[in-house]
């Protein structure tokens, strides 16, 4: 798992970061893990739309309730309407599975 985090930390372009974030999402533990959360959450706030979009997908693999604030921000104010829609769908999914912030 350390390799996945190192890949995110070492990414030098938005494309390489997006790929690393997706892999980190795939490899994230099902139980909340601060190290994975911090990196994916940062990607949800990235200036590049491609990174944010990939981070939204990464969240689907380990839907920690702690992602709700970032997803809500994307849903309410992201410049990309498609990304706003994806965040809305994911938040609805969180509601269905009972993933609420503690």
PLM region descriptions:
Residues 15-31, 52-64, 85-99:
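Structural detector for internal amphipathic alpha-helices that build alpha-solenoid repeat scaffolds
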């Amino acid at each position: 798992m350390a390799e996945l985090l190192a890949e995110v930390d070492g990414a030098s372009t938005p494309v390489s970061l997006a790929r690393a974030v997706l892999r980190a999402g795939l490899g994230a533990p099902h139980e909340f893990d601060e190290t994975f959360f911090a990196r994916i959450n940062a990607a949800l706030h990235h200036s590049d739309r491609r990174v944010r979009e990939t981070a939204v997908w990464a969240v689907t693999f380990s839907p920690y309730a702690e992602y709700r604030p970032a997803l809500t921000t994307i849903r309410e104010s992201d410049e990309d309407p498609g990304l706003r829609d994806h965040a809305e769908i994911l938040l609805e999914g969180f509601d269905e599975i009972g993933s609420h912030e503690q």
